Amino acid sequence: MNLWLWLLYFLPVSGTLKVLPEVRLEVELGGSVFIECPLPQTHVRMYLCRQMTNPAICATVVSNIFVKKEYKRRVTLKPSLNKKLFLVEMTQLTKDDEGIYACGVGTNTDLGKTQKVTLNVRNEFPEYPEPFWDDEPTSEPSPRWWLHRYPEELPWLKMGEHASPSGFIDKVTTLSPKTEAPPVHQPSTNTSVSRHPRVYGASSETPTKPSALLPATTAFKTSARQASRLLEASYSHHTRLHGERTPHYGSQYGREDRGLHISIPEFHILIPTFLGFLLLVLLGLVVKRAIQRRRAFSRRVGRMARRMRGRGPSRQIPTQRRDAPQRPRSQNNVYSACPRRAREPDNVGSAEALLLNAPASAPPALPLVIETSWPHTPSLKMSCEYVSLGHQPAVNVEDQDSNDYINIPGLPHLPSKPPGPRPSRQ
């Protein structure tokens, strides 16, 4: 019995050890966010709660019919039954909204959790690296593509096309000419250009043209970097959010989304499985013990039945002698149900012979009374105590009916006293 009580005591522990899928969200200060929560069953209470300092306590933020005071007009809950999930929208986020949340279903907020959400609110997003095509030397776009894309920002490219028939080159290696210009403006011995093309004149008479085009090139480079940085930041942010949201419902419904196979550790399933197996083993032992007891009891009952059947004929009490003829009971005798006394000798001669043969030292025997028939008189049946009265009538002693007798109830006063000695016997 103690073992069963311990098992029932530790069964709720298996629910607390369940590992919830976790989603991490990073939102800008003052922005909004959508939290997708799984909905394993419909027509139940849906909620989003916030975990307090004590991990065992989770305060409800929003549910089907409730919104916490601090989150009113900022949090909404929208069920989506066809997708088996419900959405929680949080707007106007502040630093106080940062923390750990959990969404779930059921009437009990602490036991029905299905997902854990970690929300981070930042003032500004960190600097992201430059686009990947800025670092690769072989991924430069052609000049004509830039002309169609940004015609107003690249007027110097059109000038370069008409001024220089030699075109654009990716890598140029030249020897520094001997001029009187200051050494600061002289290029190095080997010069490599891998980002943006430059125009070089065929003669050395116009050395100031490339220097005049440097501001336009710098402005274009700065604007291109800023545009690519914004695009990359937005793309990286959405990609990260999508990648973090995928395990949330992928683990519940198929674990596969857009070709991404996500594996989540499910070692927590082993605990209830082991407990269930242990309960099955104990139940089997109890059933086996009950069957053994039932079989032992049936064998014991069978042995007792056989023993009683064997002793039955030997313990039968004979109600009457087999050789004695049955005497029919008189139908008119209303006292036939009362017990009968032992029969007296049939005649007087036999009684007298017994008296003569008795030894002299023996005490004198009581006088024998021969019972004869008595006229029928109505009796009052008050009890089963009867008085037998008899006298010697003037009839033949050898009469067959002389031994018949009747019983009359013992009355306090007898109606009459017939002549002769009439000792009473009970």
Curated annotation (Swiss-Prot):
Disulfide bonds: C37-C103, C49-C58
Pfam families to which the protein is assigned, alphabetical: V-set
Chain positions of site Receptor-mediated endocytosis: Y386, Y405
Entry's localization field: Cell membrane; Early endosome membrane; Golgi apparatus, trans-Golgi network membrane; Lysosome membrane
GO biological process: Fc receptor-mediated immune complex endocytosis; humoral immune response mediated by circulating immunoglobulin; immunoglobulin transcytosis in epithelial cells; negative regulation of extrinsic apoptotic signaling pathway; negative regulation of lymphocyte apoptotic process; regulation of B cell receptor signaling pathway; signal transduction
UniProt xrefs under InterPro entries: CD300_family_receptors, Ig-like_dom_sf, Ig-like_fold, Ig_sub, Ig_V-set
Ranges of residues in domain Ig-like: 24-121
Biased composition (Pro residues): 415-426
Sites bearing Phosphothreonine, chain numbering: T91
GO molecular function: high-affinity IgM receptor activity; IgM binding; polymeric immunoglobulin binding; transmembrane signaling receptor activity
Residues annotated as signal peptide: 1-16
UniProt-annotated site: Receptor capping, residues: H268
Entry remark concerning the domains of this protein: The Ig-like V-set domain comprises three loops analogous to the complementarity-determining regions (CDR) of Ig variable domains, which are responsible for engaging IgM. Mediates multivalent interactions with the CH4 domains of pentameric IgM, facilitating receptor clustering and signaling.
The protein's assembly and partners: Interacts (via Ig-like domain) with IGHM (via CH4/Cmu4 domain), both secreted and membrane-bound IgM; the interaction is glycan-independent and multivalent theoretically involving up to eight binding sites for the IgM pentamer.
Record's function text: High-affinity Fc receptor for immunoglobulin M (IgM), both secreted and membrane-bound IgM. Primarily regulates IgM transport and homeostasis. In lymphoid cells, enables exocytosis of membrane-bound IgM on the plasma membrane as well as endocytosis of IgM-antigen complexes toward lysosomes for degradation. In mucosal epithelium, mediates retrotranscytosis of antigen-IgM complexes across mucosal M cells toward antigen-presenting cells in mucosal lymphoid tissues.
Protein's UniProt name: Immunoglobulin mu Fc receptor
Species the sequence originates in: Rattus norvegicus
